[in-house]
Amino acid sequence: RSLVGSEMCIRDRIFCGCSTAFGGSPNSHTCPVCTGMPGSLPVLNKQVVEYAAAVGLATNCTITQNCKFDRKNYFYPDNPQNYQISQLYLPICRNGHVDIELEDGTTKQIRIHEIHMEEDAGKLVHDEWDDVSYVDYNRSGVPLIEIVSEPDMRSAEEVIAYLDKLRLIIQYLGASDCKLQEGSMRADVNLSVREAGSEAFGTRTETKNLNSFSAIARAIEAEKNRQIDLIESGEAVVQETRRWDDNKEYSYAMRSKEDAQDYRYFPDPDLVPVHISDAWLEEIRSRQPEFKTEKMARYKEEFGIPDYDIGILTDSKKLADLFEATTAICSQPKKVSNWLMGETMRILKEKEMEPEDITFSPENLAKLIGLVEAGTINGSVAKEIFEKIFDEDINPEQYVEEHGLKQVNDEGALRATIEEVIAANPQSVEDYRNGKEKAIGFLVGQTMKAMKGKANPGMVNQILKELL
């Protein structure tokens, strides 16, 4: 069973007007409400309700049109009120499901028990040197939706496929950027093992501090093996919450795992029940976007690009939006796809960034593609310019003019340089004439070097072969 928490992309917090911006100096985005000061009263943010209902609709849930909030009572330093406002008895969404696609081509349905709204807690910062912990309440009161699955997943592969499906749904809705490394998407994995053929579930543990899909997969395998080892050695699995250390690939016990009755839930007296009228629900439904499956079918028909390209582009709302916007400007869908899947993904990997971190405009990418297609610059220069576009979103046309990067297409100038290269490299010339085709690559490289990378490579190859 997986519990997925997602911070919403909303400017204000769930019960107050403080900023939800990531970062900032500790305790700089706080007020009496989100720090739990006596006498402060919460006011529900309407947009949180709309996003939660939208996620519920997208995951085939039944929307609870009269839902309410409850207090979850517990003490922890990052919880200033000593209770968390959440939903237990009447959550906003229930009884949904999503279909996940597995590597062997099969599809499996994962049931969703409920989706509820709640406020986030603060953050503890541990100082190992001074052996103290500091509390930052900048995250306290940030709106969350929690998606609780049924225990339908049987492997790490299924868990990752399920989480990825939810990530895409939430991103396409614009409800969250779902960055695990920043905590805007979090997954707690509840895991138990049982003997083959047994119907009864074993004792479950909950694993926290999972900040990437790969860490989740490693933690699942480690916890599965730990529980099997305990059972096979005659020991009992303890119901507890464990913290994952990805560097050590090991989890350790944090505290005993509580059940709902341990939190002494009761209705929050400061918040009235939420009524979602039929008209309001239909308005939310009418704003549902085109999701990945529908987008893939449209791309195949409208743009005619390969299925592989379509799968990569639609796996991120940011990439899909950038692809469509750039293609609308330059009408070169395959060229746009190549730049996004090639250079863009390469740089993202090098910088350890996500597609959602892209800041360059479709206009400047379209201009770069236009410069290459017109023969104004060659491919190698275009890649250098794209690095600047990625980092600074420069205008490539202006950059080419300012730095004199226009491609040399003058046959006379090219021929003169190539003749000098041939004269300076007799061994490579002889190798080529003796049947070593690769030798011409060296001569092309020397020509490009002599012309500072601005020579037209097609013309260089043609003239070289003619002269040789």
List the predicted regions and their residue ranges.
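Amphipathic alpha-helical segments in well-ordered regions
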Residues: V55, E223, T326, W339, ...
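Core structural elements
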Residues: E182-E195, K300-L322, P333-K351, E363-L365, ...
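Basic, nucleic-acid-interacting segments
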Residues: R1, S6-E7, R11-E290, D307, ...
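Structural motif
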Residues: G304, T327-V336, A374-I377, N434-E437
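Small-residue helix-packing motif on alpha-helices
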Residues: V159, I310, V336, A382, ...
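Extended, non-catalytic structural segments that build the interaction scaffolds
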Residues: W280-R287, E324-S331, L365-I377
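Strongly charged, low-complexity linkers/loops
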Residues: P355-A366, G370, G379-K449
